Design a protein with these regions (language model features):
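Residues on the lipid-exposed face of transmembrane beta-strands in outer-membrane beta-barrel proteins
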Residues: 26-30, 48-54, 66-68, 98-104, ...
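Extracellular loop and loop/strand-boundary signature of outer-membrane beta-barrel proteins
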Residues: 34-38, 83-89, 163-166, 202-208
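Short glycine/proline- and aromatic-enriched beta-strand/turn motifs that initiate or cap beta-hairpins
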Residues: 20-51
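Glycine- and aromatic-enriched membrane insertion/assembly motifs of diderm outer-membrane
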Residues: 40-88, 93-96, 224
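Outer-membrane beta-barrel translocator domains and adjoining extracellular loop/strand segments
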Residues: 36-43, 74-81, 128-136, 201-206
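Residues that define the transmembrane beta-barrel architecture of outer-membrane proteins
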Residues: 42-46, 92-98, 112, 172-176, ...
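Predominantly the C-terminal beta-signal and adjacent terminal strand-loop region
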Residues: 76-77, 164-166, 171-224
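Repeated loop/turn-to-beta-strand initiation elements of outer-membrane beta-barrel proteins
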Residues: 22-24, 59-62, 112, 186-191
Length: 224
């Protein structure tokens, strides 16, 4: 149901673009992402893409574009903590992402304006990488298992540790976005926070809980 509503909204947006004044640009950002669970630790990634904005009137603007974004999560395998040697689960996820936000333009100087904005985002997982790191507290060292990397968009079963299955991440993600842009001429500085609605990961086998994505984005762009 939510996916259908998002598709309708995006379809209306692109129909508007065909009949109005549109500006384009490019941007690059740093991301910090995690999941909605206490064990999850944030992971730093990047985002690069194109901007596509539509001026509704003197006060309102639609902000959109298309980007390649790298997200992920770090966290301890607390469910499998049988000894002093823990296993750390690292995930890197790459998405094609389409945001759509409504912004309100606030002039604060000569050709400078603030644009607080709220909207939605829709992402599709292209590829990813997962691996387990071992933390040996007695030796105070961290080392990687060479044979324990896999595609996080597919289920992975480990027979060595209580026949544990790491469930696949969902490729589709969507949710709400709130942000703030600062435009100075053709330069755009932007920040946003994404709150995912889709349950992108169900954890380990039947033991896990459905988790949702959380992302902080800070970047800079140039409008042609």
């Amino acid at each position: 149901m939510r996916k259908g509503i998002l598709c309708v909204i995006l379809g209306c947006f692109f129909s508007i673009l065909c009949h109005g004044q549109v500006s384009f640009g490019v941007n690059a950002s740093i991301t910090s992402s995690t999941l909605s669970e206490n064990f999850a630790k944030s992971k730093t990634g990047i985002q690069i893409g194109v901007l596509c904005n539509y001026e509704l009137n003197e006060d309102l603007t639609l902000l959109s574009g298309l980007g390649y974004v790298v997200k992920g999560v770090n966290g301890l395998w607390s469910d499998l903590n049988y000894s002093q040697q823990l296993k750390m689960f690292d995930v890197q996820l790459s998405y094609l992402e389409l945001p759509l936000s409504l912004g309100y333009k606030i002039p604060i100087g000569n050709n400078i304006r603030l644009i607080p904005n709220v909207g939605i985002f829709l992402s599709y997982g292209l590829h990813g990488h997962s691996e387990i790191k071992s933390i040996n507290f007695e030796a105070e060292e961290v080392f990687r298992f060479a044979d324990n990397s896999w595609n996080p968009f597919k289920d992975e079963k480990f027979n060595d540790w209580a026949q544990t299955t790491v469930n696949a991440f969902e490729r589709w993600d969507y949710g709400v976005r709130s942000g703030l842009n600062i435009e100075a001429g053709n330069i755009i500085c932007h920040g946003a926070y994404d709150l995912g609605f889709n349950k992108v990961w169900n954890g380990y086998g039947k033991m896990g809980n459905a988790l949702k994505s959380r992302s902080l984005i800070i970047g800079i762009g140039y409008k042609f």
